[in-house]
């Protein structure tokens, strides 16, 4: 599920979702 952004600390998030805190 792509909600929009997720934790940049999570490697899985960066590979499946957008990184939050830009």
Swiss-Prot record:
Miscellaneous section: Negative results: has no effect on hNav1.5/SCN5A. Has no effect on hNav1.8/SCN10A.
Notes concerning its domains: The cysteine framework is III (CC-C-C-CC).
Site (Pharmacophore key residue): 7, 12
Alphabetical keyword list: Amidation, Cleavage on pair of basic residues, Disulfide bond, Ion channel impairing toxin, Neurotoxin, Secreted, Toxin, Voltage-gated sodium channel impairing toxin
Chief site of localization: secreted
Record-listed Cysteine amide modification sites: 20
Annotated tissue distribution: Expressed by the venom duct.
Function: Mu-conotoxin KIIIA-P1: mu-conotoxins block voltage-gated sodium channels (Nav). This toxin potently blocks Nav1.2/SCN2A (IC(50)5-124 nM), Nav1.4/SCN4A (IC(50)=20-90 nM), and Nav1.7/SCN9A (IC(50)=290-413 nM). It moderately blocks Nav1.1/SCN1A, and mNav1.6/SCN8A. It also shows a very low activity on Nav1.3/SCN3A. This toxin binds a microsite within the pore different from the tetrodotoxin binding site 1 (tested on Nav1.2). The block is partial, with a residual current that can be completely blocked by TTX.
Propeptide position ranges: 1-2
Outcome after substituting residue 5 to A: Structure similar to wild-type toxin, even with this disulfide bond deletion
Family: Belongs to the conotoxin M superfamily.
CC terms in the record's Gene Ontology section: extracellular region
Effect seen on changing residue 12 to A: Decrease in ability to block both Nav1.2 and Nav1.4. Decrease in binding affinity for Nav1.2, Nav1.4, and Nav1.7
Modification(s) after translation: Toxins with three different disulfide connectivities have been synthesized. The conotoxin mu-KIIIA-P1 shows the connectivity C1-C5, C2-C4, and C3-C6, whereas mu-KIIIA-P2 shows the connectivity C1-C6, C2-C4, and C3-C5. The conotoxin mu-KIIIA-N has the 'native' fold of the mu-conotoxin family (C1-C4, C2-C5, and C3-C6). Mu-KIIIA-P1 and mu-KIIIA-P2 are obtained by both thermodynamic oxidative folding and regioselective synthesis. Mu-KIIIA-P1 is the major oxidative folding product. Mu-KIIIA-N is only obtained by regioselective synthesis.
Residues with site note (Pharmacophore key residue, the side chain functions like a cork in the bottleneck, with the positively charged amine group preventing the penetration of sodium): 11
Organism of origin: Conus kinoshitai (Kinoshita's cone)
Record text on subunit structure and interactions: Monomer.
Stretches the record annotates as Pharmacophore key residues: 14-16, 18-19
Subcellular location: Secreted
Disulfide bridges in this chain: 5-13, 5-19, 5-20, 6-13, 6-19, 8-19, 8-20
Protein name: Mu-conotoxin KIIIB
GO molecular function: sodium channel regulator activity; toxin activity
């Amino acid at each position: 599920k792509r909600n929009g952004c997720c934790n940049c600390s999570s490697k899985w998030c960066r590979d499946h979702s957008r990184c939050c805190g830009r």
